[in-house]
Amino acid sequence: MTVQPLRSAPPSDLVIDGVPAIPDTILQGTAPYWKIDENFFMGWEPKTNAMLIDSMGKETRQVHILKSPEGESTLTTAFPENIAGASFMPQIGSPIVFAADHYGDEFYQLYSLDPITGQTQLLTDGDSRNDGTVYDHTGKQIAFLSTMSGGRYEVIYVMNPRDPDSRRVIMTPENDGWLVEDWAHDGGHILALHLTWYAGYLWSINTTSGETRLLTNTPETQKYFLEARYTPDDKGIFGLVLGVHGVITIEYLPLENNGPIRKVPPNVFDALDMELSPDGVWMAYVTGKKETQTLHVFNTITGEEQPKIPLAPALFARLRWTEDNTQLGFNYGSAAMPFQAYSYNVQTRQVTQWTHTDISSLPTAQVKPELIKMRSFDELEISGYLYRPDPQKFPGKRPVVISIHGGPSAEYVPEYLGAYNYYLDTLGVALFYPNVRGSTGFGARFASLDDGLKREDSVKDIGAVLDWIATDPRLDSSRVGIQGGSYGGYMTLATLFHYGNRVRCGSDMMGFTDFVTLLRNTKKWWQPSARRELGDERVPEMNKFLEGISPLNHAADIHDPLMITAGKSDPRVPASESDQMVKAMRAQNGIIWYMLGEEEGHGFHRATDAQYQFAAETYFFETYLLPEKRVTPLAPESITTVPAKFGTPAPTGPD
């Protein structure tokens, strides 16, 4: 990764409002952490078994070709925007098809790239959103989801990437939640997955006529599929299936009564990912929970499993086989190690690391998070991961920053902290990452416990976290900060007005401030999902409830310093959500730091923007969290008596 020299002046595309000049000690002190780059395996070149690698370029993430392990990579794309996904065409190789948006607006366009000449061609219309690209097994066609038709939902297209004019619609869904999973090997059908709250339906779509067939339409086959792949003879499907209590198994679904019987790994109840080799003989799959995942390779013909792969349990992602069926590529990382590209050879049974980043010079190279469990207000068990600074270097009770993930349908799993290791190494600040109710990974019931009128129960879970912090003799409950992005940004604001007397300050990144204005103004392709998750503001009773719990309507109750970060091109949480909160806070003379990225979306992705935002946020916490005494912008008595407002009247009706 190329790290640009940090300057005291912000990058030209950042609009700064109320953020003081950042000391050089912070700008330069945080810089080494940005030199630690994660290199992600994306796929294989089908003829040479070279790897496609996603690495940070000068400002944005770009595609590189790596011909041999630990070798010199060749920059393949030099695009002004981040590359969101790329792959060689199966069997054929060239061209590479990749996706990129504009300033983080998530209106991804598809491009083809000749890796020899560097010539790039736009494959889509330049205005729509296109994603979910899946390649057929011959390398002649791709299937993808797109809004090009102008309808409310994404439709499914197929196209020959060598001929953009060949693109055509094969299915127009009447709802959202559709994914393209695989192509039949004869090219005649596409395997599509329709995800709802209650089931994952598998459909077969004829690529010529568009005729659809529901594959899981009987009691025997009515299963919640999460992922699926055709067998090479197209007579069956392997899939990940979600069962009761969060159990995930690997199952085989025959499509013909007289089809061959394929074997699946026995006694697997915690599968997380799977991928078939092109010949269908080998299945790679990942099992485990949280940070203790294990990679396996299984023979679907003999039912035999390869010997244990010599890698410590950690995190695995993006399993992909070479066309010759001999090597499995994947990404491997942990809390102590950034993701890097690896391969496993099924013939030699050898693991090879292809990319490397040296972290030995950083003090937190061996940091190990602690899994903390606690009871919430209703005795529900919640959990989170705590990173502590070195007690020898930082004795006594340490300040804490609680960092809340977005979603809420997501889960925090201990990954490499990146620049946030600076908090542990230099500031001596502990970091706590909770998984409150509504998080995934703990079963369907847990994920539903913040639905509808129970939305603020997840905020009460943060109250339980604050209670637990007060019981730990090594943590300072009088110096707690809070931060979060997207839904975690909303949670940050909600915590500030419910528990303002128990936290010092908060940093909201791309968080929404009013449920109703968010649901009205978010992009149309995101609206159905947002309404399903957060509530439908068009229903009068729900509208009233959402207005009652929106942070914007409680701005007068926020008395702690607040930093807000927004992206002008954000399609999910419009920057207007942040603007209206800043205006409300300014009206009451609160301390508010505001940063708007004019070339950013739902997160800061340009290198210099991300570095400057992180340095500013670090300075914010250094200013308002570290001092022994609270820095108070408003009357101290108003802070110490702020009550929790969980008495907000809720409408009556079914839960």
Task: Give residue spans per PLM region.
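Flexible loop/turn segments at secondary-structure boundaries
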Residues: 199-200, 222, 245-248, 271, ...
